[in-house]
């Protein structure tokens, strides 16, 4: 009579157990000790049923099947089998003849022979295989030692059927334990044999199925439940679980395997077995359900007065950032990015930098191509952009100042990946929206441009009013805020945004990088090599970029509100709706930015065009145009898909909306870092070197407003901090500022590339007569006082404020 492998080795899903050994290999050869094995229904030696459909000498695990036809379910014994009087009589007769229970088992299973594939060496092979089998899990030594004696007792009721040799077995228990451990291997060392297994069975009555944990019995695993009738309920096995995981791993990225195809696939989102978004950095919330997330996007109706949209139950009270993020479709951006795709994306970013020849990439540890030593910041010849030697040095300096500091943090933190960066950006968006909605910026005076922007009514955005969303404080967040807005240089992060969005990010950051490089070739601690027209263009670009950043912040506020709320009666929706209709005609769909361009650049047309134009001025303006074009594209993309998302509630469209918001946040952070650098350069050139320049009076009010609202996204750097960072980087790169022009052998120059199409097609519209959004032109020394707390150190500000009092 053969017995099924399920009872001998447990459930077939336990993949660490062997299925093909004979039961005799698990029994001690010292039968004279007359030790018995537990006859519980859960022990393998107690089942007398037919053989399974598999060969005992077949060591292939994949041949197991879990259908009801293979004997695993039908051969499970019930209580009647163990109450069979004939079996009891046979057992008594075996004992009365002086044979032990182990000898009885040998007689019972004598006729069972495995297939003859291995010939006479079958038993020896089985013994070797049994000694190699490992336990699936181990107990603590104390727990194993505490319940080892349980296997030495019979589990019949009242002990009336205990044999005469039972007491002797208990006396010789210690000796038998040493023998069994030496002959069959100690269970403490991980060897899985019958002695170690049966020693874990707890003392129990005949019909009791209680065990000391899920691994103590044979088939009483945590994955299988035994019914009172003796039948088993089998859920999905480990084999099928492995297959599911394998299939999900191979298809999780779907279309992302190709570095060219980055389209958002709806099929990828159907992999519901993946962890939720916030499980990467926080404990999953019990509030989240798939049905509740869909309620958030349902369309609501109301009267023209403006009613609060219907919210899911979890949004009606104070919530955490994890609960909010779970209801924003972004799983597509949290998937891993292949290294080959990221390397290709990094190469595309620096293809436009042909002027600098070799450029160090994100995954490269080598320095860029530049000359050590003196760095000359004198003005180049007429119509030239910069000295080539100085431009290469400035390129290495700017990249090490921002990008390389972030890269070193990413490489040093193993748990840091682009998924953490996406969650950081989304958390920053939520903090920005809450800060705008709650404070309304009255604390920072009357910023005129804010008066033209709509505000969500109180009660229409409870998520912004009642949420307790905290700013992320982990090492990754600190590194992202303190690297001059360099998250845009991270190739994996750009790939996670999608094919169209990463192209937009590349276009913006390349233009800003070139402007920073060529500006650094003209300003140093020793001299400023910029004429008056170039300083005026720099001042105008700072003003226009502050206006663009304020509009971008407002876009994040309104877009997040529209993703979380589907009401169309609010003023915010009207603003976004009209923005989509005019975004192709207006920069960032804003008349304020249109008039700001006319006011700032209208008086500088002669410095931009014609023979008197300056290449450096055009480079600075091109950086601004590229940034505002990127924002304009993202605003149009968001609004063109938002109507369809509200109507169809399509997950694919929802992920596109979220990707547009995250991309705008990436560009905004890079713009804030760019503003920080060029403002520091202008202050060094104007205040420290006494170069007078006029600035619009509202410029630094907007900059202070941005510094406060976006403090969760970017940490502004003061002038003193910037100078210290720059000097430390130059010392690391073995560079030093020098006066005069480069020597004759190093005096090659860089000329401007082909003129920008955007700059050539730029049409300036003069503002109306009563237009007062930008204020008046004032000297830089006076305008900078509005943001002195952000630009200068606190000690310097306090000292400057005490000086007028001492003079009086």
From Swiss-Prot:
- Region Disordered: which residues? 1-21, 77-266
**What does the record list as GO biological process?**
regulation of DNA-templated transcription
Instruction: Enumerate the subcellular locations listed in this protein's record, separating them with semicolons.
Output: Virion tegument; Host nucleus; Host cytoplasm
> In this entry, which stretches build a coiled coil?
none
Keywords tagged on the record: Glycoprotein, Host cytoplasm, Host nucleus, Late protein, Transcription, Transcription regulation, Virion, Virion tegument
Polar residues bias (residue ranges): 162-171
Q: Where is the composition biased (Basic residues)?
A: 133-160, 197-214
Query: Taxonomically, which superkingdom?
Result: Viruses
> Has UniProt tagged this entry with the keyword GTP-binding?
no
Biased composition annotated in UniProt, kind: Basic and acidic residues: 83-92, 235-259
Q: Name one Pfam family in it.
A: Herpes_UL47
InterPro entries, A to Z: Herpes_UL47 (IPR005029)
Instruction: Kindly provide the PTM information from the record.
Output: Phosphorylated by US3. This phosphorylation is required for proper nuclear localization. O-glycosylated.
Can you supply one Gene Ontology CC term for this chain's record? host cell cytoplasm
Report, from the record, the phenotype seen after gene disruption. Answer: Deletion mutants are unable to be horizontally transmitted to naive chickens contrary to the wild-type virus while skin tropism remains unaffected. Mutants show also an increase of unspliced glycoprotein/gC transcripts.
Q: How does it assemble?
A: Interacts with US3 kinase. Interacts with UL31 and UL34; these interactions seem important for efficient virion nuclear egress. Interacts with UL41/VHS.
Its UniProt domain note says: The nuclear export signal is CRM1-dependent.
Miscellaneous: Expressed in late in the infection.
Give the UniProt family note.
Answer: Belongs to the alphaherpesvirinae HHV-1 UL47 family.
Q: What does this protein do?
A: Tegument protein that can bind to various RNA transcripts. Plays a role in the attenuation of selective viral and cellular mRNA degradation by modulating the activity of host shutoff RNase UL41/VHS. Also plays a role in the primary envelopment of virions in the perinuclear space, probably by interacting with two nuclear egress proteins UL31 and UL34. Plays an important role in the splicing of glycoprotein/gC transcripts and thereby participates in bird-to-bird viral transmission.
Q: What is this protein called?
A: Tegument protein UL47 homolog
**Organism (species):** Gallid herpesvirus 2 (strain Chicken/Md5/ATCC VR-987)
Question: What lineage does UniProt assign to this protein's organism?
Answer: Viruses, Duplodnaviria, Heunggongvirae, Peploviricota, Herviviricetes
């Amino acid at each position: 009579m053969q017995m099924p492998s399920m009872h001998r080795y447990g459930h077939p899903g336990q993949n660490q157990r062997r299925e093909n050994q004979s039961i005799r290999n698990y029994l001690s050869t010292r039968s004279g000790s007359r030790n018995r094995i537990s006859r519980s229904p859960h022990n393998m030696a107690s089942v007398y049923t037919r053989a399974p459909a598999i060969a005992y000498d077949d060591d292939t695990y994949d041949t197991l099947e879990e259908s009801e036809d293979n004997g695993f379910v039908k051969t499970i014994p019930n209580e009647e089998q163990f109450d069979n009087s004939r079996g009891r009589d046979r057992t008594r007769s075996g004992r009365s003849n002086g044979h032990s229970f182990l000898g009885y088992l040998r007689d019972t299973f004598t006729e069972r022979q495995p297939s003859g594939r291995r010939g006479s060496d079958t038993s020896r092979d089985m013994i070797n295989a049994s000694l190699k089998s490992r336990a699936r899990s181990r107990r603590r030594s104390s727990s194993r030692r505490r319940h080892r004696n349980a296997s030495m007792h019979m589990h019949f009721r009242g002990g009336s059927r205990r044999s005469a040799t039972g007491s002797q077995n208990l006396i010789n228990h210690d000796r038998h334990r040493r023998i069994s451990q030496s002959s069959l291997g100690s269970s403490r060392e991980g060897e899985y044999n019958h002695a170690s297994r049966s020693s874990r069975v707890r003392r129990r009555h005949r019909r009791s199925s209680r065990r000391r944990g899920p691994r103590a019995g044979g088939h009483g695993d945590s994955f299988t439940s035994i019914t009172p009738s003796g039948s088993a309920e089998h859920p999905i096995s480990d084999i099928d679980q492995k297959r599911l995981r394998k299939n999900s791993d191979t298809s999780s990225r779907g279309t992302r395997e190709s570095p060219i195809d980055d389209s958002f696939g709806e099929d990828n989102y159907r992999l519901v077995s993946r962890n939720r978004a916030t499980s990467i950095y926080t404990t999953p919330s019990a509030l989240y359900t798939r049905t509740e997330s869909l309620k958030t996007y349902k369309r609501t109706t109301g009267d023209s007065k403006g009613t609060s949209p219907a919210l899911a139950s979890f949004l009606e009270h104070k919530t955490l950032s994890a609960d909010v993020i779970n209801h924003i479709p972004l799983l597509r951006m949290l998937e891993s990015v292949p290294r080959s795709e990221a390397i290709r994306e990094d190469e595309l970013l620096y293809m436009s930098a042909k002027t600098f020849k070799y450029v160090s990439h994100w995954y490269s540890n080598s320095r860029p191509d530049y000359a050590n030593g003196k760095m000359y910041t004198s003005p180049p010849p007429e119509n030239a952009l910069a000295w080539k030697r100085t431009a290469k040095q400035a390129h290495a300096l700017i990249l090490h100042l921002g990008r390389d500091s972030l890269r070193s943090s990413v490489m040093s933190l193993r748990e840091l990946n682009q998924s953490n960066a996406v969650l950081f950006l989304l958390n920053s968006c939520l903090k920005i929206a809450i800060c705008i909605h709650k404070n309304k910026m009255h604390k920072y005076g009357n910023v005129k441009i804010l008066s033209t922007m709509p505000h969500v009514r109180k009660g229409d955005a409870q998520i912004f009013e009642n949420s307790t969303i905290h700013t992320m404080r982990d090492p990754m967040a600190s590194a992202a805020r303190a690297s001059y807005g360099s998250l845009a240089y991270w190739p994996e992060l750009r790939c996670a945004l999608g094919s169209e969005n990463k192209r937009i990010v590349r276009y913006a950051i390349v233009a800003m990088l070139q402007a920073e490089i060529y500006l650094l070739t003209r300003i140093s601690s020793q001299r400023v090599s910029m004429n008056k027209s170039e300083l005026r263009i720099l001042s105008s670009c700072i003003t226009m970029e502050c206006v663009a950043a304020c509009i971008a912040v407002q876009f994040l506020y309104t877009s997040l509100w529209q993703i979380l709320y589907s009401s169309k009666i609010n003023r915010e929706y009207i603003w976004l709706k009209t923005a989509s209709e005019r975004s192709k005609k207006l920069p960032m769909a804003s008349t304020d930015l249109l008039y700001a361009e006319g006011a700032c650049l209208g008086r500088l047309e002669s410095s931009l065009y014609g023979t008197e134009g300056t290449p450096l001025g055009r480079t600075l303006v091109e950086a601004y145009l590229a940034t505002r074009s990127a924002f304009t594209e993202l605003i149009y993309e968001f609004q063109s898909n938002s109507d369809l998302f509200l109507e169809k509630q399509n997950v694919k469209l929802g992920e596109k909306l979220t990707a547009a918001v995250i991309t705008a946040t990436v560009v905004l952070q890079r713009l804030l870092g760019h503003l920080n650098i060029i403002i520091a350069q202008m202050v060094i050139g104007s205040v420290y070197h006494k170069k007078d320049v006029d600035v619009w009076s509202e410029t630094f009010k907007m900059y202070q407003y941005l510094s406060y609202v976006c403090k969760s996204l970017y940490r502004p750097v003061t002038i003193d901090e910037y100078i210290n960072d720059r000097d430390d980087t130059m010392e690391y790169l073995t560079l030093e500022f020098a006066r005069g022009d480069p020597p004759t052998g190093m005096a090659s120059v860089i000329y401007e590339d082909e003129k920008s199409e955007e700059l050539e097609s730029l049409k300036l519209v003069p503002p109306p007569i009563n237009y007062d959004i930008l204020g008046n032109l004032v000297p830089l020394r006076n305008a900078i006082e509005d943001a002195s707390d952000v630009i200068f150190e606190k000690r310097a500000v306090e000292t400057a404020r005490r000086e007028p009092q001492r003079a009086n």
